[in-house]
Design a protein with these regions (language model features):
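Short, well-ordered beta-strand elements
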Residues: 317-319, 325-334
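Extracellular/periplasmic catalytic domains that process cell-envelope and extracellular macromolecules
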Residues: 28-29, 60, 84-90, 139, ...
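Short, conserved catalytic-motif segment at the N-terminal edge
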Residues: 1-38, 58-60, 74-80, 216, ...
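A short acidic/small-residue loop/turn micro-motif
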Residues: 21-25, 67, 334-337
Length: 354
């Protein structure tokens, strides 16, 4: 069994906590304070941060982002046969949050988008925009759901709209009010001593990951605050974020991080028939930063309608169940991503709730 931690909370109380350490060479004892790279579980945090600014009137969802990031107006679009064409419409904030901007970056498309290695070597979100400016996007904005670097671009938009570095905005608006003291874009010396090592599974066997396979450096002096990929966190910290979502946007100290109506908007179908997401995930729809289940019969499992959540590249995931007022978080450090852990964990939870 690979090292992992899991947490299930109902009505604000932990009802299940699990920590297991493997016997694989190179592993280390795992606890709820073990630090994990959460990769795409950064996206819901960034999406909430964006909607905080939306509530304050900083932007409307269908405003063009190019009004604050002019380089986005100059993007070219792939047109087939090695040719490109200009944008027919501008990328909007809604496009960034629902991944319909055409900005790719995952699923093998980095060769066309400026390789992931190029992204890793950058020092700031300004440099990220400069890199993306010279790369053609996959399709016209709004035409398809293409998972990629849209949320990272949103991080840069948040910097401009808020007038402060993205990491400081997250710290002030989300992390401090929720008590998420170990969640950040870098590793301290103490963090590195608690950083879960990566394991790679090939042909049914596990081996330790290499430094190159870690991919991100988490250097304290870097200003590359990748809002879609770059945060590290712990089981307890991410649980605090989840509890805020269960509590309809309210922090333990009573502060309203986001309004209930904003959360409802984030959990409404934003793709509305746009291809690229629901066609491959039966029963699920995509909102603004989260998946949500709208047809449990199509899913074919025992999860109730209305659950929502997301996962991360190295086999982390979470889900929120508003109806039962519960959340669950699972963290491991395994590549490639193992989706079975999420399915089996969730199935076991709802079997127990019968």
């Amino acid at each position: 069994c690979l090292s992992n931690v899991a947490l299930l909370a109902s009505d604000g109380k932990v009802v299940y906590h699990h920590a297991a350490t493997s016997k694989f060479p190179g592993d280390r004892p795992i606890t709820e304070k073990t630090v994990f790279p959460i990769w795409s579980m950064s996206k819901p945090i960034t999406s909430v941060a964006a909607m905080i600014l939306h509530e304050r009137g900083a932007f409307k969802l269908d405003d063009p982002v190019s009004t604050i990031i002019p380089q986005l107006a100059k993007l070219r679009v792939k047109a087939g046969g090695g040719k490109t064409e200009p944008l027919k419409k501008q990328i909007t904030y809604r496009d960034l949050l629902r991944h319909s901007s055409g900005i790719a970056g995952y699923d093998g498309s980095f060769d066309q988008q400026g390789t992931w290695k190029e992204v890793m070597e950058l020092d700031s979100l300004v440099e990220l925009i400069d890199l993306l400016e010279v790369k053609p996007i996959e399709h016209q904005p709004g035409k398809k759901h293409t998972y990629g670097l849209s949320t990272a671009v949103m991080g840069r938009a948040i910097e401009i709209l808020s007038g402060q570095p993205f990491d400081k905005f997250l710290e002030r608006e989300i992390f401090k009010p929720l008590g998420m003291e170990y969640t950040r874009f870098y590793l301290t010396e103490q963090d590195r001593g608690r950083f879960q090592p990566l394991f790679v599974k090939l042909k049914g066997k596990f081996r330790p990951g290499t430094p190159a396979e870690d991919e991100l450096y988490y250097a304290p002096k870097s200003s590359l605050f990748l809002g879609g990929e770059g945060l590290v966190s712990t089981l307890g910290d991410y649980g605090r974020f989840c509890q805020m979502l269960v509590d309809r946007g309210k922090a333990p100290n009573g502060k309203q991080i986001i309004l209930p109506k904003t959360l409802d908007l984030m959990l409404s179908d934003q793709l509305e028939g746009i291809p690229g997401y629901g066609d491959a995930r039966k029963g699920y729809a995509f909102g603004l930063g989260f998946y949500f289940l709208e047809d449990t019969k199509k899913e074919g499992q025992n999860s109730p309608n209305g659950i929502f959540g997301w996962g991360g590249y190295h086999t982390t995931h979470f889900w929120i169940d508003p109806k039962n007022k519960l959340y669950a978080v699972f963290m491991a450090r395994l590549y490639p991503y193992n989706g079975k852990t999420q399915t089996e964990f969730r199935k076991a939870v709802y079997e127990a709730l019968k």
